[in-house]
Amino acid sequence: MNNQSFKNSLSLKVILKQRKRNRLLLIFLCFFIVVIAISLIMYAMRNMVSFFRTPSEITKEDILIGRPLRLGGFVEKGTVEYIGKMKVTFFVTDNAKHKKVVFIGILPDLFREGQGVVVEGYFDKQGLFVGKRVLAKHDETYMSKETADHLNKHHTVEK
């Protein structure tokens, strides 16, 4: 009988080890599936993410890729040009560099030269920023503190 209890004890230990191994395998598998799912979601959304950049922060890759992004800074004085009723061109500057923007649509009421602006759009093949949406700003709500400090160091916002 002693031999029988030893066998039962041994088989119980084997069963417990198998369960523990299976549990660890299940936890690892769940973790792996979650990591893969998050990676796929991030990969699928990479073109939908709209980054905020000042003209100085724009890279050649931003221009070549033509991905959606946000261009922020101030509307450069003397650059707003209306072409027809709905088309307007202007330069967005951070006082170090500037980028030309082409926008077709109705501008917000707060839009004016010297005022802060964020333009959502993309760069076309000629390097012009094609705006799809213009957000005129009356403060630094749309930008990080570092970006606002950089812009305000060289520019006084008109109120």
UniProtKB/Swiss-Prot annotation:
An example Gene Ontology molecular-function term: heme binding
SS bonds (residue pairs): none
Periplasmic topology ranges: 45-159
Keywords: Cell inner membrane, Cell membrane, Cytochrome c-type biogenesis, Heme, Iron, Membrane, Metal-binding, Signal-anchor, Transmembrane, Transmembrane helix
TM stretches of this protein: 24-44
Tree of life domain: Bacteria
Any single GO CC term annotated in Swiss-Prot or TrEMBL for this entry: plasma membrane
Cited InterPro entries: CcmE (IPR004329), CcmE-like_sf (IPR036127), NA-bd_OB-fold (IPR012340)
GO biological process: cytochrome complex assembly
Membrane topology: Single-pass type II membrane protein
Short name of one Pfam family: CcmE
Main location as per UniProt: membrane
Subcellular location: Cell inner membrane
Residues bound to heme: H138, Y142
Residues in coiled coil: none
Residue intervals on the Cytoplasmic side: 1-23
Membership in a protein family: Belongs to the CcmE/CycJ family.
NCBIfam families: PRK13254.1-1, PRK13254.1-5
Role played: Heme chaperone required for the biogenesis of c-type cytochromes. Transiently binds heme delivered by CcmC and transfers the heme to apo-cytochromes in a process facilitated by CcmF and CcmH.
Name of this protein: Cytochrome c-type biogenesis protein CcmE
Species per Swiss-Prot/TrEMBL record: Bartonella quintana (strain Toulouse) (Rochalimaea quintana)
Classification lineage: Bacteria, Pseudomonadati, Pseudomonadota, Alphaproteobacteria, Hyphomicrobiales
